[in-house]
Amino acid sequence: MNKIQHISFITKKNPLVSYERVGALQNRFVQHYLNYKANKVEQPPKPTIITSQVCPVYTLGRRESSINFTKGFPKAKVVKALRGGQTTFHGPGQILAYPIIDLKSFGLSPREYVSRLEQAIIATCKSFGIEKAHTTKNTGVWVTENDKIAAIGIHLRRNITSHGLALNVSTDLKYFNYIVGCGLYGKNTTSFKDQGVFTDLKSVEKVLVNNLDSFLMSK
């Protein structure tokens, strides 16, 4: 049984949700943690993971003020995010996973936290036969030195995590052609489908959440 509470927006009836709606729920959980730390509420919050598949959107990192598309203007919204990192794309065929936990409770540094996110993603990829999944000097999970399958961008406030990871399962990769993903020139984005693995989001979501639970909840 998972130690972490899981809330999923990925359903057959409503497979897509707005990025803003996911963010609003995430902020509610973060605020609960902050209120608890400030002794404003007695009930401690539960460690939580929110997973979703959002409508097409480009998000800017907190240090960016605008986006420069490399060619034309794609049909997608542009939204400012609090996470670290630079511009990336979120949309159909991609799993967004936002863990909301107190790093201090688990004795994790921000660097160790990111490392555990990467380990959970790698374990998930390998469960579906993508054995080449690995880390490099650049944050995220890669299948070659130039092909990234998952991006990571986090935000911390009083050791409370928000935002998290984006894992490409069957994402339409053309959206990445309009940007320099995460500010990394000469790098590409790949997906399970692009790697010859054809599966559905719910199957990958289940394995990913179990792996995140295993890697994040162990002290």
Curated annotation (Swiss-Prot):
InterPro entries per record:
aa-tRNA-synth_II/BPL/LPL, BPL_LPL_catalytic, Octanoyltransferase, Octanoyltransferase_CS
Q: Which GO terms describe its molecular function?
A: lipoyl(octanoyl) transferase activity
Q: Its pathway?
A: Protein modification; protein lipoylation via endogenous pathway; protein N(6)-(lipoyl)lysine from octanoyl-[acyl-carrier-protein]: step 1/2
Residues forming the BPL/LPL catalytic domain are 43-219
The record lists substrate as bound by: 83-90, 151-153, 164-166
Q: Which CDD domains match?
A: LipB (cd16444)
- Anything else of interest in the record? In the reaction, the free carboxyl group of octanoic acid is attached via an amide linkage to the epsilon-amino group of a specific lysine residue of lipoyl domains of lipoate-dependent enzymes.
Function (record text): Catalyzes the transfer of endogenously produced octanoic acid from octanoyl-acyl-carrier-protein onto the lipoyl domains of lipoate-dependent enzymes. Lipoyl-ACP can also act as a substrate although octanoyl-ACP is likely to be the physiological substrate.
The entry sums up its family as follows: Belongs to the LipB family.
Recorded protein name is Probable octanoyltransferase
**Species name:** Schizosaccharomyces pombe (strain 972 / ATCC 24843)
Q: What is the lineage of its organism?
A: Eukaryota, Fungi, Dikarya, Ascomycota, Taphrinomycotina
